[in-house]
Amino acid sequence: MCSSDLLEKSKTDGDAPAVFDFSSWDPEPAGSHPDNASCYGVEDLVGNGWEWTSTPFAPFPGFRASVSYPEYSADFFDGEHFVMKGASPATARELVRPTFRNWFRPRYPYVYATFRCAR
């Protein structure tokens, strides 16, 4: 699987069509939105499903927990949760950006998730 850094580098900041913000309840076939391809020609990087990465969810250098919600991320820096990138059909438009990180445990069954292999 790709690392979180590799997927982020491949992302596009464009506002081209994708499947998020409940625009569809179901994923669409890969390649359905060619206008949303990154500058590297990689398609379907935002929307249609969170993409699993091989990167454990961990704090960035200088991380400080939010005063109003300290357990939001820190409780999940346990080596059992992995970074997910992109967005799913159920992701709100405000959260859709190349730098947003989500996280889940690999065996969690209730997430719109996809994965991508790279050489």
Which residues does each PLM region occupy?
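Long, intrinsically disordered, low-complexity Ser/Thr/Pro-rich regulatory/activation regions
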Residues: 99-104
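Short, structured beta-strand segments at or near domain termini in extracellular proteins/domains
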Residues: 110-119
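Functional-site microenvironments in short loops/helix caps that host divalent-cation chemistry
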Residues: 4-98, 109
